[in-house]
């Protein structure tokens, strides 16, 4: 299976005020592949990632998954569940009144897992990142790095087919950033997901299978 991006164009505004943000984007990401998107501010990276996640519609072009349009005419996943697309953002966005384990189990139960299934899955994921002793604490009791690790495992809770990450290490120091990207890569490889991450940090490029450079709404060679 692959995610295929074909001739994606995105314009904002109309007439004289129209701005062309994406100008015919084409690439493929195979199952189990971890790809980094890089480019200067305003190059179209976040707009592209938002389109791939179904949060924004393109002006023209197609996104295919498993040889079928990723989204139908109502902009719903046509061959996937919404839970099959996982998002990781710059900020952790943890729910302040939920304990660490509840941040994950709630996601699992909303996707159809039983309470026992979601609890087992959450404990295993948190154990993978060394937070098994922090299950019952609240977000304000965590460090910034711990919060981000919880947010990342939350994105992987439902074994999504596609992971989209927008600068997930932007607020972390070099050591923590490396550990976070290693964690993301490991999950993508082990679960054979399709992974796309935006980052400006060139030190992290070595963890990607491929780096796609964007400039002025186009992919550069």
Swiss-Prot record:
PANTHER family: HEMIN IMPORT ATP-BINDING PROTEIN HRTA-RELATED, IMPORT ATP-BINDING PROTEIN
Localization (cell): Cell membrane
Matching Gene3D superfamilies: P-loop containing nucleotide triphosphate hydrolases
Described purpose of this protein according to its UniProt entry: Part of the ABC transporter complex hrt involved in hemin import. Responsible for energy coupling to the transport system.
Family matches, as SMART domains: AAA
Record text on subunit structure and interactions: The complex is composed of two ATP-binding proteins (HrtA), two transmembrane proteins (HrtB) and a solute-binding protein.
Record key words, sorted: ATP-binding, Cell membrane, Membrane, Nucleotide-binding, Translocase, Transport
An MF annotation (GO) of this entry: transmembrane transporter activity
Main location: membrane
Record-listed E.C. numbers: 7.6.2.-
Residues of the ABC transporter domain: 3-221
Name of the protein this chain belongs to: Putative hemin import ATP-binding protein HrtA
PROSITE patterns: ABC_TRANSPORTER_2
GO cellular component: a single term: plasma membrane
Family to which the UniProt record says this protein belongs: Belongs to the ABC transporter superfamily. HrtA family.
CDD domains: ABC_MJ0796_LolCDE_FtsE
Induction (record text): Highly induced by hemin.
SUPFAM superfamilies linked: P-loop containing nucleoside triphosphate hydrolases
Positions of ATP binding: 39-46
């Amino acid at each position: 299976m692959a995610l295929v991006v074909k001739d994606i164009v995105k314009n904002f505004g109309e007439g004289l005020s129209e701005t062309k943000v994406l100008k015919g984007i084409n690439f493929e990401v195979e199952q189990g592949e971890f790809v980094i998107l890089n480019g200067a501010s305003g190059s179209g990276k976040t707009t592209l990632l938002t389109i791939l996640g179904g949060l924004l519609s393109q002006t023209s072009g197609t996104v295919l998954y498993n040889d079928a349009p990723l989204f139908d005419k109502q902009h719903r996943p046509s061959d996937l569940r919404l839970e099959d697309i996982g998002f990781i953002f710059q900020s952790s966005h943890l729910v302040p009144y939920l304990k660490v384990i509840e941040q994950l189990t709630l996601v699992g139960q909303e996707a159809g897992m039983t309470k026992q299934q979601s609890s087992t899955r959450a404990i295993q994921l948190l154990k993978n990142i060394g937070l098994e002793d922090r299950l019952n604490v609240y977000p304000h009791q965590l460090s910034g790095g711990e919060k981000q690790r919880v947010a990342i495992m939350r994105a992987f809770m439902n074994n999504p087919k596609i992971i989209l990450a927008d600068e997930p290490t932007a607020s972390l120091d070099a050591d923590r950033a490396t550990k976070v990207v290693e964690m993301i890569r490991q999950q993508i490889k082990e679960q054979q997901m399709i992974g796309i991450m935006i980052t400006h940090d060139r030190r992290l490029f070595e963890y990607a299978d491929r780096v796609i450079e964007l400039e002025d709404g186009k992919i550069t060679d």
